[in-house]
Amino acid sequence: MNTATLLLLTRPATSSAPTDDNGFVEADASSPHVNVMDLGITRGDGFFETISVVAGHPQALEPHLARLKHSAELMDMPEPDTDVWRLAVLAGIEAHQLEHGVQRELFAKLIMTRGVEGTGTPTGWVYVDTGEDFTAAREGIRVVSLDRGYRHDVAETSPWLLQGAKTLSYAANRAALREAARRGADDVIFVSSDGYALEGPTSNVIVRNGNRVRTPATDQGILAGTTQASVFEFFDARGFETSYEHIPANELAAADALWLVSSVRQASPITNLDGKDFQVDADLAAELNTYLLSRTH
């Protein structure tokens, strides 16, 4: 049964023509709405954001909207009207709750495409739905490292590759996850061709050595993580030293703890990386996820 609440944006961009509505309309999520010639479908030419919604609260809404604008800028697309997108997210959550009741965890997905080729009119929509049960993943995951095929400085040398934009073109990321499954793992840490740890297909990497907590720097063509920022707030408040660095992948094996963190799954401690077992501090992992799930902004 389709439980998603769908809102179609009538004014997805600041350049969109004025409308008589709030910039969006609710639609039947079980019916087709996107033109089959839309470049988001035919070329994967667009971007998206996925926002965790806990007890009715969209988490890190403003950072997600800022990242939406950043993706548009990198892709030379019209600037999203974040006032409309914000209202659409909140309206989608409210409508979903009215129909299905208040649920502990939902997600809101925001999608904007370049639209039908030649029209210059972007397409946008938001849908809100229940997600997977990530209880097991929050207790621990097995991970493999895979070569991404790019140097760590690819965003500088080759900006047309759109590293750092949250594009709709996730075929390679999904292929990486299938490769991980073939190797008996749950997820992936991408490594640059010159040996630096980068990110997961849908997550950021957190590395702890003693009182020091690091994440790969975003100047390596990786997404600035909204959940990662909250993880740093958690560790900062507990006296840890946090930093963004270029982290050689061969240093990961010496870490005291590793996590993959993302908006909906939250924080997943790594129990095994490339065959090496890691001891998980279950109390710390639970405390971190409790903190992340308690965010109301």
Go through the PLM ranges and name each one.
Residues 1-80, 87-91, 118-297:
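Helix-start/capping segments and mature chain N-termini
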Residues 12, 86-115, 129:
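Short, acidic/charged, Gly/Pro-enriched secondary-structure junctions
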